[in-house]
Swiss-Prot record:
It holds the Pfam family TsaD. This is tRNA N6-adenosine threonylcarbamoyltransferase. GO terms for biological process: tRNA threonylcarbamoyladenosine modification. GO terms for cellular component: cytoplasm. Keywords: Acyltransferase, Cytoplasm, Iron, Metal-binding, Transferase, tRNA processing. It comes from the Bacteria. The lineage of its organism: Bacteria, Pseudomonadati, Spirochaetota, Spirochaetia, Spirochaetales. Its cofactor is Fe(2+). It catalyses: L-threonylcarbamoyladenylate + adenosine(37) in tRNA = N(6)-L-threonylcarbamoyladenosine(37) in tRNA + AMP + H(+).
Amino acid sequence: MKVLGIETSCDDCCIAVVENGIHILSNIKLNQKEHKKYYGVVPEIASRLHTEAIMSVCIKALKKANTKISEIDLIAVTSRPGLIGSLIVGLNFAKGLAISLKKPIICIDHILAHLYAPLMSSKIEYPFISLLLSGGHTLIAKQKNFDDVEILGKTLDDSCGEAFDKVAKHYNMGFPGGPNIEQISKNGDENTFKFPVTTFRKKENWYDFSYSGLKTACIHQLEKFKSKDNPTTKNNIAASFQKAAFENLITPLRRAIKDTQINKLVIAGGVASNLYLREKINKLKIQTYYPPLDLCTDNGAMIAGLGFNMYLKYGESPIETDVNSRIENYKNQYRRRK
């Protein structure tokens, strides 16, 4: 079965063709560079650019896959969570294709798709612990199947990727913040500033994260946390911030691994491409899986791959399915399917 996967939840216009949930025939992505001068994604600009680009991206994906549109068996599309305007462009495009081609459509949860992505490159037996790190989400999950996901912990304020973006914006390091800070930090001393690392002691927040304190310390209280007589350079700020940002993840992650007795870890999301993070995670000395770099960030392949499995198990989505920008009752919603 050939699945067309459409992902437009934020600023990347992504369309892929995947066969039988795992064989990637094409995986086309168009980055919207127009947001760089704003140091963040402007929703109105994102949706307009999706509208302008989505047809050409689809044509490129089909051509790369050597597949005619009539040979597509299923259309999978992100319907939540994300920017409303961007989601609408992708969903309406998918609905138009489904109706005109008389093909089934399956609406996909963006978070579940990120958690599925590592399975497209590695054979991983359930259960395992997943760590999702992206511009919009930071969470730890226990996975028993592609559709049986229990959120153990999440960020209580900024996501990890969002904190990187805000620090990078303040110090003019470029957008997106993650890859720019990673590059700039290579020539810095990570011990110049000793930024705070947040861990929670209450049971209800045992696996949760917080990045607001670290962000405030780095942007507004920089000199207060200086621990070495090194110059206050962008390189040293970037290196010290990156170190603290990833140390913020380690304690909740250790707790989740210990409490669940699950010794397999899957890392997903755009921040998972950070090589410094991978060094930190590898020190945990447990079996760890990373998706290839093109499956870390937003992509259509993960939508198509998960869509294939969801369709086989649950069938097609109602054509009237709408978009949703958020997940209400966040921690509990992901156990909705049994």
